[in-house]
Amino acid sequence: MLILISPAKTLDYQSPLATTRFTLPELLDHSQQLIHEARKLSAPQIKKLMNISDKLADLNATRFHDWQPNFTLENARQAILAFKGDVYTGLQAETFSEEDFDFAQQHLRMLSGLYGVLRPLDLMQPYRLEMGIRLENAKGKDLYQFWGDVITHKLNEVIDAQGIRFVINLASDEYFKSVKPKKLNAELIKPVFLDEKNGKFKVISFYAKKARGLMSRFIIDNRLTKPEQLKDFNREGYFFDEEASANGELVFKRHEQ
């Protein structure tokens, strides 16, 4: 199985590293093209494009300017340890063993607006470039047109090399839109997490994001290889609902806390 997750806007470049091992992103040539485009933007333009504060716009203008392709542990950090959003709160990669990192390196991929596809141990320099942003580039009006089939081809390389039969889509819609499902050489499985509120089950963004991280960790902890094994997921009160699941979706519910 291959797990797909989204990146996070919140980054951590201060905490102690859980491992000193690293690899380098495989699509850095593409990243450099995007950096070239992003450097043309002033801080006010970044503010408008990303709908962020003056302070964040200044920070990201500086990040684009400072970005350079020679990554080391001094100027970059492993992606799975650098991202710190709700998904990564559930994943808790800072507590991985070396064996966990090994399994994740084979079976987990992070989709990224700037880096395309990241393996857990791939070094990355800090950035903010969400996949849905309309950054004009040589290939079109946004990042979906920029990446085209590149991300799908990169995922297929892993799928074909490892004989993977299933892709577990734990990414957000914004990021998964960069993948061409019909061109993937594997079957798609999408876990959906519903929380009860006022007697009704629905997707609550914060909880759903954390649950995607919890599910990723569950797969890694237990070295799972088959989709049916996902049905045993029961962390933090979630349970599998067979009746609600269909068409490649596995529905997990949790009663109101």
From Swiss-Prot:
<dbReference type="InterPro" id="IPR005583">
    <property type="entry name" value="YaaA"/>
</dbReference>
<dbReference type="GO" id="GO:0005829">
    <property type="term" value="C:cytosol"/>
</dbReference>
<protein>
    <recommendedName>
        <fullName>UPF0246 protein YaaA</fullName>
    </recommendedName>
</protein>
<dbReference type="GO" id="GO:0033194">
    <property type="term" value="P:response to hydroperoxide"/>
</dbReference>
<comment type="similarity">
    <text>Belongs to the UPF0246 family.</text>
</comment>
<dbReference type="Pfam" id="PF03883">
    <property type="entry name" value="H2O2_YaaD"/>
</dbReference>
